[in-house]
């Protein structure tokens, strides 16, 4: 959809959101019938994004969309694994031979990933790339990997196997063949950056990046519904109110997948076992930082209620909902 294609987003947001994990309803819209919502959607970072503003002035939505796209592009140039010229691709090629000096934004993601690794007990680990390669999530293979292949890949996985120099903002791999995948953290940072830049344009709005949501300003909360993980084309009976300024992310095993021998494998790989996790539920996280919500939903999907309880206790404000299959 191009920039001139606008719509009252009551329908478009619901449709896009249903595809990506959410249905957003303004909890008190019925009491404020004059409130107007406009939205524009576009493809970026391998998914669909949508920018929604409430009661925007003339030209504000277009300017806001351009602002959001510019922030997303910053992260794409850094974290795109499919672009050999991206900063992350350069890091993965050279960090075993010599230390790699990171840009400020890449370093920000790596430090958050370090915290995530320790907080989750290794459930979230950006060094999972060798396993993602092995299981065919970048380039499909003919059959599922065997146990020996998984063990070999696991030797290259583990955040504790990289060396960070926080004074020089550098990183070095200690094992050949290691690689970083920022897929579980980059979209969150992109949303945080876009929200910061959008703050002066609009009082109230929603940014949606492939189902990762950031709610902008205002005083009203947003009613969020969550997909049924057993029937992803329908919503579950779980809803919650997300406050202004908060972020929401859901992880489940019903999105990206590969099929080997008639068996379906979801894209969320446990970096400890080396196998894709068949979750009992989906995990939805609501907290202030979109980057934190991004990785935490993945970690909670893998580790379940115990980690969810820890996060709610130690990351307040943080709200987590598990929807069982």
Predicted features along the sequence, with ranges:
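Mature catalytic core of soluble alpha/beta enzymes
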Residues: 2-325
């Amino acid at each position: 959809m191009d920039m001139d294609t606008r719509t009252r987003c009551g329908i478009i947001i619901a449709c896009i959101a249903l595809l990506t994990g959410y249905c957003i309803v303004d909890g008190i819209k019925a009491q404020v019938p004059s409130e107007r919502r406009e939205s524009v959607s576009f493809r970026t970072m391998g998914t669909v994004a949508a920018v929604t503003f409430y009661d925007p002035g003339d030209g504000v939505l277009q300017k806001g969309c351009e602002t959001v796209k510019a922030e997303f592009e910053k992260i794409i140039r850094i974290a795109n694994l499919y672009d050999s010229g991206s900063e992350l691709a350069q890091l993965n090629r050279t960090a075993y031979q010599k230390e790699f000096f990171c840009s400020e934004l890449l370093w920000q993601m790596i430090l958050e990933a370090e915290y995530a690794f320790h907080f989750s007990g290794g459930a979230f680990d950006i060094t999972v790339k060798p396993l993602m390669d092995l299981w065919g999530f970048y380039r499909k293979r003919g059959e599922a990997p065997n146990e020996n292949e998984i063990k070999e890949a696991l030797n290259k996985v583990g955040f504790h196997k990289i060396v960070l120099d926080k004074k020089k903002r550098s990183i070095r791999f200690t094992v050949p063949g290691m690689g970083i995948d920022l897929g579980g953290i980059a979209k969150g940072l992109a949303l945080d950056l876009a929200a910061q830049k959008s703050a002066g344009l609009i009082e109230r709005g929603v940014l949606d990046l492939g189902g990762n949501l950031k709610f902008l300003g205002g005083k009203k909360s947003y009613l969020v519904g969550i997909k049924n993980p057993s029937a992803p084309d329908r919503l579950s009976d779980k809803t919650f109110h997300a406050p202004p300024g908060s972020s929401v992310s859901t992880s489940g095993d019903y999105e990206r997948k590969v099929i080997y021998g008639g068996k379906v494998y979801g894209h969320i790989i446990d970096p400890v076992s080396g196998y894709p996790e068949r979750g009992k539920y989906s995990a939805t996280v609501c907290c202030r930082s979109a980057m934190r919500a991004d990785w935490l939903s993945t970690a909670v999907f893998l580790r379940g209620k115990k980690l969810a309880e820890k996060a709610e206790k130690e990351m307040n404000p943080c709200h987590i909902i598990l929807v069982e299959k």
